[in-house]
Amino acid sequence: MATPGSEPQPFVPALSVATLHPLHHPHHHHHHHQHHGGTGAPGGAGGGGGGSGGFNLPLNRGLERALEEAANSGGLNLSARKLKEFPRTAAPGHDLSDTVQADLSKNRLVEVPMELCHFVSLEILNLYHNCIRVIPEAIVNLQMLTYLNLSRNQLSALPACLCGLPLKVLIASNNKLGSLPEEIGQLKQLMELDVSCNEITALPQQIGQLKSLRELNVRRNYLKVLPQELVDLSLVKFDFSCNKVLVIPICFREMKQLQVLLLENNPLQSPPAQICTKGKVHIFKYLSIQACQIKTADSLYLHTMERPHLHQHVEDGKKDSDSGVGSDNGDKRLSATEPSDEDTVSLNVPMSNIMEEEQIIKEDSCHRLSPVKGEFHQEFQPEPSLLGDSTNSGEERDQFTDRADGLHSEFMNYKARAEDCEELLRIEEDVHWQTEGIISSSKDQDMDIAMIEQLREAVDLLQDPNGLSTDITERSVLNLYPMGSAEALELQDSALNGQIQLETSPVCEVQSDLTLQSNGSQYSPNEIRENSPAVSPTTNSTAPFGLKPRSVFLRPQRNLESIDPQFTIRRKMEQMREEKELVEQLRESIEMRLKVSLHEDLGAALMDGVVLCHLVNHIRPRSVASIHVPSPAVPKLSMAKCRRNVENFLEACRKLGVPEADLCSPCDILQLDFRHIRKTVDTLLALGEKAPPPTSALRSRDLIGFCLVHILFIVLVYITYHWNALSA
């Protein structure tokens, strides 16, 4: 049912057609137009009368006709009659208990009339544009009410009793609501909720219980945060424009059924304004990218024991007859296509290596987490049993006794190195690893936030995604002992047939030896000696077809000490400290020159090129004619504008005389290569310090020359004047 002059109510016409009898609807429609026109009918005269006085007779005529029509049709229309209360005088003469629709909009009611609360068949109630401040609890009697319009009133709160109605549409816009009741979650059938133009500061969490809600309008309120519970709703339209929302939660990307999203006039920071202006698709794409970045960052900090077990990958490898060594998925792996006598068992050996490697890594990670040094021996007690149980008879056990002793000694050496690694990893005891951002707040393991951030950055550096990935076991070793790809894995040219030999950590070699011993029943002692790194290098030449054994875990004994993971970690930490000092020096240089305080994140301050352009303009004015600067509406420049600023800065540096050797590239600035940026800035500042004296000297020379020419001209004029005077 459309109301005269009211706001658009999309739900009313549908209910009007469904609830009113078709024979009564045209008559009601005609009556509606009479009121809208305001002429010709007694109802129109009544609409212009007051509640008392000389207009009682026209008012009573209009009310009588409206009430009589309501009793016959079930639709009560008392709109725009300036009523301050329900007309009680005429009501007893008519039976309105079966009223289905009631329109009391555009009146002067200060509360919902109690008479309406007795219309138990009422389905649609329109109280638009009144002065209502109170809603009686008796409204809970309207258990057939599905549409309620309370817009443009003076309500300061919605009563909890209102949430006990079977409402499908609730419109309470243009009121003074400060909040929504927590009982709003009881409106299970609510499909449309409009609380726009109010004073709501926060939405209750119970709003996520409105499973039938399809349209939510919270426009022009004081919302700062959008509750994540909105994701649980199947919203089709969501309007939160003209609020104070700063961030759209990342989880909103899961609102798959959302078709209309209105968010203008919000000080949004995430997503940025240039993304929001492009529409819902770009906003959701931005949120998805942010979610992927968060998931990727979180996966880097997972503990070794929390990561997926290796046997899951091993099972996948068995299905396609690939041990993980010979796979070529684009990374630098060893090729396993060369023919050899081992081909019949080439699949079993790497599988056993991987399974044994997983067990050793788990036990070693448990040891590194344990504060008690004595637990190290308990963790590795099962290993000698592997050597003993692998032989099926006493003779085979005797054959491998000497070799087992050698392996045990190597294993003890490995254990000692692991203990040294544990000692080195205690950053608070190593003065070389302490940087300005890594400090201990107390001796009771209360670590400073800066230390945690530095450690996370260290993990990012050490777990380089561009590194070599040889197989599943080697990735687990890199997780156990984080090393950079360039230092942890070395590809050396082997003197034997030009083959490539892969350098791995000492863990790989020990595990290879243990695995070969545990599977000794499948090999002869000679085969084991050929695959053992303890044998002389000449034994490698006895491999079939002159090729090296395909085990990726083998390497010469001479390189055991050449790759030290502790040294690699130390070097990474030193590089981090040097880079931090470099950034601070660069910050001081720019701040001293510009006399401003830069943002805490220097990389973000330099990447857009604005600061650099101001720096070169400070050294020589108007070197960069136009600079793209962020605005409050667009707080971040696009990549094209950032690159244009950077290119203008570099071009100005060339004009000032910065050598090409000292000039960084645009990619260095956009990718925050502080070493090259520092070199360019230092050269620029040095030229700036040398430039003023020649400039001032040049200006003085020009001034002196101008004065001399002026004096000479005056002298010539004087001589000419006197010469003419004498000759005359």
Swiss-Prot record:
**Phosphothreonine modifications at:** T568
Write out the function statement from the record. Acts as a negative regulator of GTPase CDC42 by sequestering CDC42-guanine exchange factor DOCK8. Probably by preventing CDC42 activation, negatively regulates CD4(+) T-cell migration.
User: Which Gene3D superfamilies does the annotation name?
Assistant: Calponin-like domain (1.10.418.10), Ribonuclease Inhibitor (3.80.10.10)
> Can you tell me where the transmembrane regions are?
none
A GO biological process of this protein is: negative regulation of T cell migration
Q: Where is the composition biased (Basic and acidic residues)?
A: 311-322
Source domain of life is Eukaryota
Pinpoint the residue ranges of every LRR repeat in the record. 98-119, 121-143, 144-166, 167-187, 189-210, 212-234, 235-255, 257-278, 283-304
The record's Gene Ontology cellular component field reads: cytoplasm
PROSITE patterns per record: CH (PS50021), LRR (PS51450)
Q: What residue stretches are annotated with the Calponin-homology (CH) domain?
A: 576-692
Q: Where is this region: Disordered?
A: 24-57, 311-348, 377-398, 516-547
Cite the CDD domains for this sequence. Answer: CH_LRCH1
Q: Kindly give the InterPro entries that the UniProt entry links to this protein.
A: CH_dom (IPR001715), CH_dom_sf (IPR036872), Leu-rich_rpt (IPR001611), Leu-rich_rpt_typical-subtyp (IPR003591), LRR_dom_sf (IPR032675), LRR_domain-containing (IPR050216)
The entry's localization annotation reads: Cytoplasm
Q: Where, if anywhere, are coiled coils annotated?
A: none
Its name, as the record gives it, is Leucine-rich repeat and calponin homology domain-containing protein 1
| Compositional bias per record (Basic residues), positions renumbered to this chain | 24-36
Q: Where is the composition biased (Gly residues)?
A: 37-54
Q: Which UniProt keywords apply?
A: Cytoplasm, Leucine-rich repeat, Phosphoprotein, Repeat
Subunit-structure text: Interacts (via LRR repeats) with unphosphorylated DOCK8 (via DHR-2 domain); the interaction prevents the interaction between DOCK8 and CDC42.
* Positions bearing Phosphoserine: S370, S409, S532, S536
Polar residues: bias regions: 516-525, 533-543
